[in-house]
């Protein structure tokens, strides 16, 4: 007698998918939606993402590693040049490149620039994702999908898939995960169960502090903010049942006037940044946090190679 439905199990798949797109195209929000947890900071400020962060999606049949990259753009500073170089290096090492094109905006020169760059990477599978569909009408989404197909034809880019998705509402997020897994090579699990990111906790904490600092900032100031965690560890002498994580971090800006904006009247804004960041860090790490923040000036750090090295770029 044979067991019905007991045929060979599908092979396990694993691999890397990189989300690319112009600044503020929804890459980070989509990464968090697929992982199911906040592993990448988000903001409506362009060029929020400055590091390559890997978010890990665990499934019975696959492990999908999502590589969130800074937005590709025409750089105006040394920092911008280094971020672009970081993206291009990353794209050479992944299995699938997924280009994010917001459905609530027309395909523009920035999108064309990026897809042209992608066309130069010959052997990597390419997917187009129409992001932010919750902000567009059905007619607009249909028009956008046709524009994406046309852009592929014009640039010589062969799309393996074109997928409309809303990370905010969750619409088609699971479908996108299924499609991406299907494009991965067969392979073993690459990260332990339970790992949601490969970033060190110090980097995740610094990014959450920067996200809190960016809220409400205008003009060029968001680009001038950098955060470095100088010291982080469990406080000694605490009972095991009541741990406390001490984090000492510096928020860097480029000018004295910017320092005053970050601190705010009588330190009110800095306290607010600390309160919001502490809540996010505690939610991510599952440990009560004591957060000590200081604001320092690193003059013109975006253009200074020595300062960039000091700040981790």
Swiss-Prot record:
Membrane topology annotation: Peripheral membrane protein
Keyword RNA-binding attributed: yes
Compartments where found: Cytoplasm; Cell membrane
Main subcellular location: cytoplasm
Span of domain KH type-2: 217-299
Chain intervals for the UniProt region annotation (G1): 21-28
GO molecular function: GTP binding; GTPase activity; ribosomal small subunit binding; small ribosomal subunit rRNA binding
Keyword annotations from UniProtKB, A to Z: Cell membrane, Cytoplasm, GTP-binding, Membrane, Nucleotide-binding, Ribosome biogenesis, RNA-binding, rRNA-binding
InterPro entries on file: G_ERA_dom, GTP-bd, GTPase_Era-like, KH_dom-like_a/b, KH_dom_type_2, KH_sf_prok-type, P-loop_NTPase, Small_GTP-bd
Biological processes annotated in GO: ribosomal small subunit assembly
Residue ranges, annotated region (G2): 47-51
GO cellular component, one term: plasma membrane
UniProt subunit comment: Monomer.
Family to which the UniProt record says this protein belongs: Belongs to the TRAFAC class TrmE-Era-EngA-EngB-Septin-like GTPase superfamily. Era GTPase family.
Protein name (database record): GTPase Era
Native source species: Nocardioides sp. (strain ATCC BAA-499 / JS614)
